[in-house]
Amino acid sequence: MIEFAVAGLSDPVQATVPWLSLSILVPIGGALLIPFIPDQGEGKQIRWYALIVTLITFLITVAAYLTGYDPSLSGLQLFERVSWLPEIGLTWTVGADGLSMPLILLTSFITSLACLAAWPVTFKPRLFFFLLLAMDGGQIAVFAVQDMLLFFLAWELELLPVYLLLAIWGGKKRQYAATKFILYTAGSSLFILLAALAMGFFGGGTPSFEYTALAAKDFGSGFQLLCYAGLLIAFGVKLPIVPLHTWLPDAHGEATAPVHMLLAGILLKMGGYALLRFNCELLPAAHAQFAPLLIVLGVVNIIYAALTSFAQRNLKRKIAYSSISHMGFVLIGIGSFSVLGSSGAMLQMISHGLIGASLFFLVGATYDRTHTLLLDEMGGIGQKMRIMFALWTVCALASLALPGMSGFVSELMIFAGFATDEAYTLPFRVVICGLAAVGVVLTPVYLLSMLREIFFGKEKAELASHTNLVDAEPREVYIIGCLLVPIIGIGLYPRLMTDSFSSSIEALVSRDVTAMEQLTKPTAPLIRGQSTVPAILRAPNLGTPTPK
C-alpha cells in the first residue's frame, strides 16, 4: 500500500466572485438563447451575437485569472461548492489550479477566434453557433470541475456538438468521420464512468467524487493499476495515443476551419490534462509503474506520426498526423519524474493548441481559395498570395520548434527534463532521447516540403483558372496575428506562461516521486528499483529506494 501526503489538493481558496461558474454558464446560456435571436436569414445577427458571447466568456476567464488566481499557490483556487445530489455524494464543485487555469484561458481564447473564423458559415448558422457555444461551455467545464462525475458529464457534453459539427458541415465523408469519432470517444468514455464509480464508492470513507476526497482515499496498488489502465485508454483516445488515433485524421479530413481549431486547439488537450489530473495526481502508485510505458508510447507517437505525415498528400491529413506527433512529446513529459519535464508537457499542450489552431485555420483558408486539399494539385500560388505565404511560413516555423517560438521552449524542457531524470537508467534515457530526436528532424522536412509544394513551382492550370486566388483578408490576418502573439511571447519569455502552473507541477511531481520511492518491487523494469531491473539497464551508484 502506498502512503503519501495530499500535496496541493487541500485548503482550497474560496471564490469571492463565481468566475468559473460564469465561464461555464454564460456560453451554455447564450447557446440556449440563440433560437430567440431575430435574424434575416443570412446569419449576420447570429454571428455577431455568438462572437459577443465568446468574447464575454474570454473576458470572464481573464478576470478570474487576474483577480482571483495566485500562481504561487499549488492548491485549488476560485473554489465553489454547491450541494447537488448529496445522496450519492455529487456536488457542483469547481476550482482552478496550475493544471487547469492555463487551459481554461486557452479554451475561451481559441473559441472566440474560432467563432470569428466561422464568419463565412451561411448554412444553418443558428444551429452551428448554438453548437459552438455549447461546446465552449462543455470544454471549460472539463477543466474547471472538481468532481469526477461532473467531469464525466462535461466530457460527454462536448461530444455531441463535435459530432453534429462534423456530420452536418463536414466534407464528402462527413458521416463516416463523425460516426467514427463518436464511436471512439463515447465508447472509451465508459472507462471514465466505471473508474469514477469505483473510486467514489471504494477506498474507505464517505462516498464522494470530489478530487480532494479521492486523493485522500486509501486505494490499493492493484486497484490503482486497474483504474489507471482504464483511464489511460479513455484519455489515450482523446490525446490521441497510437494506435487509438485513427479517428483524428478522418475527423480533421472532413471538418471545417473553425471545427479544426477547436479539435486541434482544445479537444486534444483534454486528454493530456486528464492524464495529469487523474492518472498522475490521483493514482500515483500506478503512475510510477505505468510511466515507462507512457515514455515508449510517446516515442511511437512522435516517429510513427511524423513518418506518416511525411507520406500524406492530403493537406489536412498531413497536419493532423503532425499534431499526433507533437502530442507524443506531451506523453514523454508526463512520464518523466522531473518538474522540468512535466512543466514542458504542460507548456507543449498550450503551445500546440495555439500552433495547431493557426495551421488548421490556414488550411481552411487555403482550401476556400484553391478548392483542393491535394498537394499534387497545388503549386505556384505564392506570387498571388504573398501575405498568405508569409502567414503559412511563420506558423510552420513555429510548428517545427524554431527558437524564439513557444514550441522550441516546450520541447527543449521535455528533452532536458527527461535526460536529467535519474529515476530512469542512463541507457534508457539515451535511447528515448535519440529516438525522439528523429521526430524533431523529420518535422522540418515534411513541413518545409509542404510549403514548397503549395506556394512554389509552376502554377497548375486548374488553379490558374480560379478567379478567387486572392490574398489573405484582414479577418484572416487578425486571427493568425492573435495566435502568433502568445506563440512568440512564450517563445521569447517562457515565464509568461510557466509561472502560472509551476507551483502545481512541483506539487504533482513531488507526489509521484514519493509514490515511486515507496515501491518496493516496481513492475516497471526501466525505473530504478529493486530486484527485477536487469543489471545492464541500471545506472551505477544511483542507490535503492528505501523500502517501507
UniProtKB/Swiss-Prot annotation:
Membrane topology category: Multi-pass membrane protein
Enzyme class, spelled out: translocase
Any one Gene Ontology molecular-function term assigned to this protein's record: NADH dehydrogenase (ubiquinone) activity
UniProtKB keywords: Membrane, NAD, NADP, Plastoquinone, Quinone, Thylakoid, Translocase, Transmembrane, Transmembrane helix
Membrane-spanning residues: 17-37, 48-68, 103-123, 127-147, 149-169, 181-201, 222-242, 256-276, 290-310, 327-347, 348-368, 389-409, 430-450, 477-497
E.C. code: 7.1.1.-
GO biological process, one term: electron transport coupled proton transport
The keyword NAD is assigned to this record: yes
Coiled coil: none
Catalyses which reaction(s): a plastoquinone + NADH + (n+1) H(+)(in) = a plastoquinol + NAD(+) + n H(+)(out); a plastoquinone + NADPH + (n+1) H(+)(in) = a plastoquinol + NADP(+) + n H(+)(out)
Membrane recorded as keyword: yes
InterPro entries listed in its UniProt record: NADH_Q_OxRdtase_chain4, NADH_Q_OxRdtase_chainM/4, NADH_UbQ_OxRdtase, ND/Mrp_TM
GO CC terms of this entry: plasma membrane-derived thylakoid membrane
UniProt subcellular location: Cellular thylakoid membrane
Pfam families documented for this protein: Proton_antipo_M (PF00361)
General function of this protein: NDH-1 shuttles electrons from NAD(P)H, via FMN and iron-sulfur (Fe-S) centers, to quinones in the respiratory chain. The immediate electron acceptor for the enzyme in this species is believed to be plastoquinone. Couples the redox reaction to proton translocation (for every two electrons transferred, four hydrogen ions are translocated across the cytoplasmic membrane), and thus conserves the redox energy in a proton gradient.
Family: Belongs to the complex I subunit 4 family.
UniProt cross-references to PANTHER family, sorted A to Z: NAD(P)H-QUINONE OXIDOREDUCTASE CHAIN 4, CHLOROPLASTIC (PTHR43507:SF21), NADH-UBIQUINONE OXIDOREDUCTASE CHAIN 4 (PTHR43507)
Name of the featured protein: NAD(P)H-quinone oxidoreductase chain 4
